[in-house]
Amino acid sequence: MVSTGWALPRVVVAAPASGHGKTTVATGLLGALRRRGLTVSPHKVGPDYIDPGYHGLAAGRPGRNLDPWLVGPERVAPLLRHGASVPTPADVAVIEGVMGLHDGAVGRRGYASTAHVATLVDAPVLLVLDTTAQGRSAAALVLGMRAFDERVRVGGVILNRVGSPRHETLLRDALAEVGVPVLGAVSRSAEVAAPSRHLGLVPVAERAPESLAVVAALADLVAATVDLDAVLDLARSAPPLTAPAWDPLAAVGGPVSTAAGGGPAGVTAGGGPARTGGPTVAVAAGAAFTFSYAETAELLAAAGATVAPFDPLRDPGLPAGTRAVVIGGGFPEAHADALAGNAALRAELAAFDGPVVAECAGLLYLGRSLDGAPMCGRLDLTARMTGRLTLGYREAVAAADSPVTRAGERVRGHEFHRTVTDPGHGDTPAWRFDGAAHGFVDGRVHASYLHVHWAGQPHAARRLVQACR
């Protein structure tokens, strides 16, 4: 583990509430700074999968999440240092917040909030402020945000949706009164929007050409409206990052010895797992299954697996030699017909007798049908879209042994979906939380709606590779 201090410039992009323009500014900053020739490390507070996709496109390296609830507060700074080091050391890290600056896990007094993460990584905050229908009161709002928690340093403001030059002058003068510098101003007419869906933005993988255009437009916008030198000065005011870098090899305790070979798969120059002689773990990817944390593949590789992505929309079969399968989240409901049309892969997954781990979208895909379209039939359930959004952090207890859990273990995860399954859980459920059973353990299959970040549960990766024996 690296343990010496690293003077990593870093800044947290936050807001008083959702909808103020954090993603616009953070993504634009990443793209604009990269155009300057800087190596930029992108990060996102919270469990969200979609924003990091845009961040990664803008920065040219994977977007990574920093979530104290999912991984534990002690791992947040090490994960930042790891992400900013792979595949090469970054010149600056940009961390987009979640919701409002002080909004975190319900009833936990700001735990897992953007403010909490800002203190854990000792980074200054750049506050994005929607100024629609606001004048001098904007300064009072910023003053309150700054004073609410004295450990959080609000180092500057970017004014968003400014109505006119006169409006901008009024806002700048008011913020000067409270001693908070304005580092940029974006007019209402200059806004750039990315298409949205019921769970947020449309993932990058589903609209690659359009996503490139949106990210380029955001970089143009920020370069034209934000004082990038002032933002860099703010980021450089962060003290050295003294936390040791998170190490996937140390987290899993080294490679597992298996019949198919036990050498560690390692990591390529691009940050992905290298292909070696370890057991092949197939990981669903493509437009329908975009929800995955970068550390999942790193942990599997460190445990000795060869990680092989496959696209259930296009690939007629699992990668050669597959010993285990991981199917994460995404939007299968938007691709149900195309998934149904790949009958050969559905049949192979239905008959696959190795360990399978599925989260949310993966759960739906393993069922008999989704909104009437045939799926794999590996699990005896049907699924359908509803108008109700189920979301939030969960504290769960494993209800049974499985390829990745042991009965009685406690984990922290999150749910985020608008679908339901019938039945809601199997005879042997995967989890128990909120006084109810959830998910399915069926033979060597573990499937549920719960998303878990494996950096907080590294034994899951090790166990899955062990289950390949």
Go through the PLM ranges and name each one:
Residues K44-V45, V182-A190, T306-R314:
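Beta-strand->loop->alpha-helix junctions that form or flank phosphate-binding loops
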Residues A118, T276, T290-A308, P319, ...:
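C-terminal and late-domain segments of enzyme folds
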Residues P332-S402:
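Cysteine-nucleophile active-site neighborhood
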Residues P279-N342, R346-A351:
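Phosphate-binding active sites in nucleotide-utilizing proteins
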Residues S85-D91, A243-G278:
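Intrinsically disordered, low-complexity terminal tails and inter-domain linkers enriched
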Residues V12, V94-E96, L126, I158, ...:
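Structural motif
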